[in-house]
Amino acid sequence: MSGGLDVLQMKEEDVLKFLAAGTHLGGTNMDFQMEHYTYKRKSDGVYIINLKKTWEKLLLAARAIVAIENPADVCVISSRNTGQRAVLKFASATGATTFHGRFTPGTFTNQIQAAFREPRLLIVTDPRADHQPLTEASYVNIPTIAMCNTDSPLRYVDIAIPCNNKGHHSVGLMWWMLSREVLRMRGTISREHPWEVMPDLYFYRDPEEIEKEEQAAAEKAVGKEEFQGEWTAPTADFAQPEVADWSEGVAVPSVPIQQFPAGIEGKSFTEAAAPSKAPAAAEGFAEDWSAQPATEDWSAAPTAQATEWGGASADWS
């Protein structure tokens, strides 16, 4: 299908992407019409899909999509959850019309319906899960493209792209590859430069997994805040008041000034700052008990005070 052109050949990086996403892994059952798309069977019973034929059918599907003049006439459908995000991304990149979720029966055949559509091309993710739109497309002669596994029925399918349509990584990568080839064939992007859109944007994410990741991130943020609040001292506020007019006096905070008693003129600062000694009468009984008392000399002659109270010459009669 590449016609021997080097620009259309499958690159090594594309093969690595296919292998990493598990696109080459089929199912354990085999449909007789999908037999020529398989390479071999492993010992555990899983069929291996030939990626060379996957690439050729991918280019054929991209050429069929580019042949439609109005991109809105291309209808893409995925009833499985694994392909709904990829379908929306494909429609956003190429301008196609998307039906994600449940397909309303009669959309292609019942003209009385408000949601009646007449697409020129139909692309489905799984022929078994999306059998209703395939059946209705056969009634109104709409060509169909389907991503088929080894056990997928090929009834009403015009272009089958052999791949693993069960894994969400494989489905997202296949829609990403199809989007890139369509844009390259339209001339929107160049083949010489890699496409800046990552395949991760096409992968399905479980809502419970997203909720768990958000909860874990919130708990981590709360724990980090508690750790910082416990060990980090609060920052002091050193904001100074702004002075608009420097001619006005700046308010100075009140500072207690030490009061000195009168009569300290002519004294040094140390003498003035030292506490003055109060008179002995004012101290009362506040004596210094730590001082050593004077030792009396009992051998000395009695003093006048002793004579006043009486002594050897006192008359006690």
Curated annotation (Swiss-Prot):
Subcellular localization: Cell membrane; Cytoplasm; Nucleus
Segments of skewed composition (Low complexity): 271-284
Transferase in keyword set: no
Sequence segments annotated as region (Disordered): 271-317
CDD domains, sorted: RPS2
Homology family: Belongs to the universal ribosomal protein uS2 family.
Function statement: Required for the assembly and/or stability of the 40S ribosomal subunit. Required for the processing of the 20S rRNA-precursor to mature 18S rRNA in a late step of the maturation of 40S ribosomal subunits. Also functions as a cell surface receptor for laminin. Plays a role in cell adhesion to the basement membrane and in the consequent activation of signaling transduction pathways. May play a role in cell fate determination and tissue morphogenesis.
Quaternary state and interactors: Monomer (37LRP) and homodimer (67LR). Component of the small ribosomal subunit. Mature ribosomes consist of a small (40S) and a large (60S) subunit. The 40S subunit contains about 33 different proteins and 1 molecule of RNA (18S). The 60S subunit contains about 49 different proteins and 3 molecules of RNA (28S, 5.8S and 5S). Interacts with rps21. Interacts with several laminins including at least lamb1. Interacts with mdk.
Record-given protein name: Small ribosomal subunit protein uS2
